[in-house]
Amino acid sequence: NYETLILNLGLARVALGATTTGATLLGPGLVRAGGEGVISIERHQAIGTMEEALKSARFNLQLVHDAQSLVWGKLVINAAINPLTALLGIPNGELLERPSAREVMSALAREVADVAAAEHIRLPFSDPVKAAEDVARLTAANHSSMLQDIRRGAPTEIDAICGAVVRAGKKHN
């Protein structure tokens, strides 16, 4: 998405980042925040206006030097948790209670971490399996965005999440 946005909007109007804030889409234009998280955005010359806007809106903002690491870290977590919860129709924490689901979640986390390594991206954690399990535990009652999409008959992010990993991985086979 980052590259597409730059092509269409220009580098000065795009910032790479990630957030740890969860949310539930309640309806068109209506979202319920799932707790206070952090918005991490890569620091670059054009970030000033965006930084001011986010801070004035009282978002918890962190400027970082390597947002790519955070984006891929989030990709590891999302690819390990979201598709499984959507397929099984269960909240995040239940992945830890089902041995076969936990095994697949671990394999997915390792696979995405391997692709990140092939892309020369340093993840923000050393153990992708532990990171995915920690997030599943911390968000045990949450229903992933992909599960929410399935339940309301909306398109999912399967291509944006898993497809991104497949496309990156194909470059290294």
PLM region descriptions:
Residues 10, 31-35, 79-80:
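Short, hinge-like loop/turn segments at secondary-structure boundaries
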Residues 18, 35, 65:
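Residues at the C-termini of beta-strands that transition into short coil/loop
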Residues 48-82, 130-131:
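FAD/FMN-dependent oxidoreductases across multiple families
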Residues 68-114, 140-141:
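Active-site-proximal catalytic alpha-helix in oxidoreductases
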